[in-house]
Amino acid sequence: MLEFHADRKRYFDIQVANAEKYVIPFIEEKIRINPGMRVLEIGCGEAGVLKAFINKGCFGMGVELDAPRIEHAKEYLAGDYAAGRIQFISKDIYQVDAEKELGGLYDIIVLKDVIEHIHDQPKLIGWMKNFLKPALSADRPGGVIFFGFPPWYMPYGGHQQMCSSWLKKIPWVHLLPKTIYRWLLKRNKENADAFLEIKETGISIERFEKICGKQGYEIENKAHYLLNPIYEWKFGWRGRKQVGIIKAIPFVRNFFTTCVYYLIKVK
């Protein structure tokens, strides 16, 4: 697993394939993605997800605080970058001016495997209205936001698969009390601060939906996965949606749902 994330080009290629096979079809269940649409990804990394949208004729803008990852993205998308089909900015999203730095508003905003790392998630989710195109008519319904994330209570919701020790094989270990978890991490020479930060920011299905409602959004589409679609490339397991009876049980569903997709829009 660690090797998978360390090989950035392979990870980029997998993100492209996953977005083309799962993310874009999920969005297109509700809106058609047409050439010329503007797509903003917050926390874009190497921009593999954005590449899938560019392949459909969209313009992509990637926001990423980790500048070296943007340099990798520029390398992997050299042709698209040179042609102006994608641009990047390395800046705190709260300091970004939509008109001056992003070139205007967007049809689609993407946060994939990002929201579970964000402090003050209500603030960010509310703030994104500043970058969405407004609804003008039935034919111009306004922008949407896509989220993909692992619920905190799922077997590896603490991202402990990134550990270098035996802890990477232990499901739900991240749910131990903080003091015990910290001791285990330090005992096994892991980066305790990094994994404990995820413990602070992890988000459940119910909390995410509650935040969206309080911030003035409505849910356009959602999919809960028993097997995360990305597992198709990691392990050879095809993405599989959660069974209805589990999906219908609040809180309990978090423990057995490895990934959720949501599409939201302003009410």
Where in the sequence are the language-model features?
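Conserved N-terminal segment of class I S-adenosyl-L-methionine
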Residues: 1-104, 108, 125, 255-262
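Pocket-edge positions in alpha/beta enzyme catalytic cores
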Residues: 11-15, 117, 200
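A structural helix-start
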Residues: 67, 118-119
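S-adenosyl-L-methionine-dependent methyltransferase catalytic module, highlighting the catalytic core
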Residues: 119-131, 137-262
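A short beta-strand submotif of the Rossmann-like class I SAM-dependent methyltransferase core
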Residues: 111-112
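Adenine-nucleotide cofactor-binding loop residues
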Residues: 94, 115, 153
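Active-site beta-strand termini and strand-to-loop segments that position acidic
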Residues: 264-267
